Amino acid sequence: MNFKYIVAVSFLIASAYARSEENEIQSLSQRDVLEEESLREMRGIGTKILGGVKTALKGALKELASTYVNGKRTAEEHEVMKRLETVMRDLDSLDYPEEASERETRGFNQEEIANLFTKKEKRILGPVLGLVSNALGGLLKNIG
């Protein structure tokens, strides 16, 4: 009789442990899903902000480019113009990443592609802001 109770209690303990493990796995998977959703939301917000910044920069760069095109340029201004043209191409490639980097992204999974574009945006926006500030400073210096 004792043996039957020991087996029954052992079975109950084992089934309770299995249920707790199953519940823990489910809660972990739910937590992973929630974390992924929040990451997607943050990326969406970041993408919208970055899109606005890119649009503003492109407008400022086009204005600067038209200013430089209309007047005579020194060698330094010519170099700045070349840099602005390069930056414009890079910003356009951010708007159309499928066309611009199709060769780069073959064989990568989606996460690697997202990381690649994030790194590319950071690599481009840092120098762009410096270049725009230098160009605006030079333009204001020439005007004033």
Curated annotation (Swiss-Prot):
<keyword id="KW-0929">Antimicrobial</keyword>
<keyword id="KW-0027">Amidation</keyword>
<keyword id="KW-0964">Secreted</keyword>
<feature type="signal peptide">
    <location>
        <begin position="1"/>
        <end position="18"/>
    </location>
</feature>
<feature type="propeptide">
    <location>
        <begin position="74"/>
        <end position="123"/>
    </location>
</feature>
<feature type="modified residue" description="Asparagine amide">
    <location>
        <position position="70"/>
    </location>
</feature>
<dbReference type="GO" id="GO:0050832">
    <property type="term" value="P:defense response to fungus"/>
</dbReference>
<feature type="propeptide">
    <location>
        <begin position="19"/>
        <end position="43"/>
    </location>
</feature>
<comment type="similarity">
    <text>Belongs to the bombinin family.</text>
</comment>
<keyword id="KW-0295">Fungicide</keyword>
<dbReference type="Pfam" id="PF05298">
    <property type="entry name" value="Bombinin"/>
</dbReference>
<keyword id="KW-0204">Cytolysis</keyword>
<keyword id="KW-0878">Amphibian defense peptide</keyword>
<dbReference type="InterPro" id="IPR007962">
    <property type="entry name" value="Bombinin"/>
</dbReference>
<comment type="function">
    <text>Maximin-2 shows antibacterial activity against both Gram-positive and Gram-negative bacteria. It also shows antimicrobial activity against the fungus C.albicans, but not against A.flavus nor P.uticale. It has little hemolytic activity.</text>
</comment>
<keyword id="KW-0732">Signal</keyword>
<dbReference type="GO" id="GO:0042742">
    <property type="term" value="P:defense response to bacterium"/>
</dbReference>
<dbReference type="GO" id="GO:0031640">
    <property type="term" value="P:killing of cells of another organism"/>
</dbReference>
<comment type="function">
    <text>Maximin-H8 shows antimicrobial activity against bacteria and against the fungus C.albicans. Shows strong hemolytic activity.</text>
</comment>
<feature type="modified residue" description="Isoleucine amide">
    <location>
        <position position="143"/>
    </location>
</feature>
<keyword id="KW-0165">Cleavage on pair of basic residues</keyword>
<keyword id="KW-0354">Hemolysis</keyword>
<protein>
    <recommendedName>
        <fullName>Maximins 2/H8 type 1</fullName>
    </recommendedName>
</protein>
<dbReference type="GO" id="GO:0005576">
    <property type="term" value="C:extracellular region"/>
</dbReference>
<keyword id="KW-0044">Antibiotic</keyword>
